[in-house]
Amino acid sequence: MLTFKQIKRAIIDSLTPELLTAQYRAGLSTDDPVETGHCAVASEAFYYLAGGKAAGFMPVVCGYSTHGGDALIFDPAARTQAETKGAARETHWWIKGPKNGIRGGGDIFDVTAAQYPFAFPYENGRHTGFMQPQQKPSRRAQVVMDRVVQKLGAANLAAYRHKQIADFQKAQRKNRLHKQPRI
């Protein structure tokens, strides 16, 4: 059975500069980790490969501002003030897994964590949906997913996805049984 670590490695190995938006591609440095700027597309690819909503996964985004090498600014008022002085508006995306049948209540799955030289402050994130209103992978995420399928195999990924979904559904049933009133 595949692990998150194996899927993460395959996603990272599938990231290429043409998948970046022009804004991020222009800001890349040759010594940046390959993950830099790919957080949304990498998180989206993992979300769908792992079973998405049916498996209890939840996208999370965190907005912040930064000015050069300065610290990240999360407070909304401070962000607005910093942005008027030239600070860049940024976001970071990751996925939260399920816990005890609760969607998005568990572990953090951050495919692109290595783009930060410190532990990202995940407590500043908020649950969200992806930017695709059709509830399907974006074109860029689909490119990454297709590359991951080639690396790891469709059957292996399907087994991982089905296990995630089955485990989440089992936990939900167990949760419902414990919440039923006793007669």
Regions found by a protein language model. Name each.
Residues 1-182:
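A structural boundary/capping signal
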